[in-house]
């Protein structure tokens, strides 16, 4: 199976760290559970929802980049899926350097044929341009993400879709743990 992966919240459990940083930036004025829910929609959505100033956005980005990869661990059993798939690619809004830092830390670079990162010049999701580029090059079968934003472009170009730890409508498959990947995903 040839798989396109989102990065944050799909391969790596980064949202806890993001939530803690935004909670700090907001001076504890918003409960972490509420921050998490808004961040899961998108960072852009969360910044508008919480009316972050440019200074607060800059503070968030600075603090988030300073978090050790140790605090951004891969989800359990996802490495088993990476090992068993034919090919893996990443499409993320995260800057390439940040992706590489985390992949280097865990020794995971060899699992990915290509990474399209946020600073590569492609339009942001849900625009399908980056997905189409990767699909044309690698003949993908499945896109896995944790947000509807991750599956909309995949659907548009005809890929099967899987939402991870998200039960929103629209995906072909749903997973709460990667331990169930091959029991659940039938393509």
Walk through the language-model features, giving the residues of each.
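Asp-based, Mg2+/Mn2+-dependent phosphohydrolase catalytic module
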Residues: 1, 100-187
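Ser/Thr-centric signal marking residues that sit
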Residues: 10, 14, 92, 161
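Short, acidic loop-to-helix structural element flanking the phosphoryl-transfer center
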Residues: 66-90, 96-100, 128
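N-terminal helical cap/lid subdomain that shapes the substrate entry/recognition surface
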Residues: 1-76
């Amino acid at each position: 199976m040839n798989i396109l992966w989102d990065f944050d919240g799909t391969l790596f459990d980064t949202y806890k760290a993001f939530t803690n940083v935004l909670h700090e930036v907001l001076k504890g004025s918003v409960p972490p559970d509420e921050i998490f829910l808004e961040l899961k929609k998108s960072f852009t959505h969360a910044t508008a929802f919480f009316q972050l100033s440019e200074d607060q956005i800059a503070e968030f980005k600075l603090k988030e980049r300073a978090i050790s990869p140790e605090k951004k661990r891969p989800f359990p059993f996802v490495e088993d899926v990476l090992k068993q798939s034919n090919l893996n690619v990443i499409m993320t809004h995260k800057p390439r350097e940040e992706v590489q830092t985390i992949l280097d830390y865990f020794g995971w670079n060899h699992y990915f044929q290509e990474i399209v990162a946020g600073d590569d010049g492609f339009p942001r999701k849900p625009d399908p341009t980056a997905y189409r580029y990767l699909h044309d090059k690698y003949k993908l079968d499945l896109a896995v993400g944790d947000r509807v934003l991750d599956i909309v472009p995949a659907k548009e170009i005809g890929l099967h879709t899987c939402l991870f730890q998200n039960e929103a409508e629209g995906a072909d498959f749903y997973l709460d743990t990667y331990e169930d990947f091959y029991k659940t995903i039938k393509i």
